[in-house]
């Protein structure tokens, strides 16, 4: 009689087989997150390239916006749908386009296509970082950090227009189109004086400063200079081993500033914290603008400036500039309103 000791092999189902295939070690990792990331990224990029190459914005903005119409890579864009479409998702098979691809493009359907697939593609990329971090057994701080640009994208391209009258007021996907949106934000929301924008700027520029300082410091202490040191020694090292020293770096910055990071974990957490928090705060500010919340309005200065021609501050000057942006921009930017301003109400500078 034969006695078998041990557990019988469990029958593997389709889920286990799919899990094995998705998470197999290959040149480009797919994973479960890839089921969301790869198709969404493909469609978002494909829709964007199709839009800037072939699709006009004549029916939505009264503009030329494609290479086919003579735009270059700075002025081409995938434009938002017209204001009359409201917050329609503009499905190709929906009541607006009714399955007609040409009409769908004319109505701005590519914008919602790119925006929604782009948002899910970014989320898929964050999930990819979670998944690979779990596989190689490291902490998921990369994914947490990547949530910051996702928050900015979702707040600017989705939440803000949802708070306004339609997708029309979101940024179009293009370089010059984004610049137009920035001017719009300043003129209509006084965005640069918003404390959340200030925190965002402090976070991004502070992160750039920290990155430059950190890179230079590590490069400075990575190799030990001998008598033959010169400016380009760091790029042509002759040492067998690196000589990086946190203690030396700490001594250097203690002498420069009087303070320095005491350990690597605190230093690198701070480099993570500054830009991520700045972007999160900026995204929160844009959500506020979606609800048309105002930030700093120094009404007392505006009243005094209106009463006293000799009283002016940089704030009151900026308020006048914002009024100029609105007056000059609105008629061109919102053709559906059919705005006509009499010549005498349009502000003109000395050069005009």
Swiss-Prot record:
Binding of pheophytin a, residues: 129, 142
Main location class: plastid
Enzyme Commission number(s): 1.10.3.9
Residues recorded with modification N-acetylthreonine: 2
Domain of life: Eukaryota
Binding site for chlorophyll a PD2: 197
Catalytically driven reaction(s): 2 a plastoquinone + 4 hnu + 2 H2O = 2 a plastoquinol + O2
Record keyword Plastid present: yes
InterPro entries: D1/D2 (IPR055266), Photo_II_D1/D2_sf (IPR036854), Photo_RC_L/M (IPR000484), Photo_RC_L/M_CS (IPR055265), PSII_PsbD/D2 (IPR005868)
SUPFAM superfamilies in UniProt: Bacterial photosystem II reaction centre, L and M subunits
Free-text cofactor note: The D1/D2 heterodimer binds P680, chlorophylls that are the primary electron donor of PSII, and subsequent electron acceptors. It shares a non-heme iron and each subunit binds pheophytin, quinone, additional chlorophylls, carotenoids and lipids. There is also a Cl(-1) ion associated with D1 and D2, which is required for oxygen evolution. The PSII complex binds additional chlorophylls, carotenoids and specific lipids.
Compartments, as annotated in UniProt: Plastid, Chloroplast thylakoid membrane
Residue positions binding chlorophyll a ChlzD2: 117
One Pfam family linked to the record: Photo_RC
Residues where a plastoquinone binds: 214, 261
GO molecular function: chlorophyll binding; electron transporter, transferring electrons within the cyclic electron transport pathway of photosynthesis activity; iron ion binding; oxygen evolving activity
Family (UniProt): Belongs to the reaction center PufL/M/PsbA/D family.
Note: 2 of the reaction center chlorophylls (ChlD1 and ChlD2) are entirely coordinated by water.
PANTHER family: PHOTOSYSTEM II D2 PROTEIN (PTHR33149:SF12), PHOTOSYSTEM II PROTEIN D1 (PTHR33149)
Function: Photosystem II (PSII) is a light-driven water:plastoquinone oxidoreductase that uses light energy to abstract electrons from H(2)O, generating O(2) and a proton gradient subsequently used for ATP formation. It consists of a core antenna complex that captures photons, and an electron transfer chain that converts photonic excitation into a charge separation. The D1/D2 (PsbA/PsbD) reaction center heterodimer binds P680, the primary electron donor of PSII as well as several subsequent electron acceptors. D2 is needed for assembly of a stable PSII complex.
Record's protein name: Photosystem II D2 protein
Originating species: Oltmannsiellopsis viridis (Marine flagellate)
Name of the coding gene: psbD
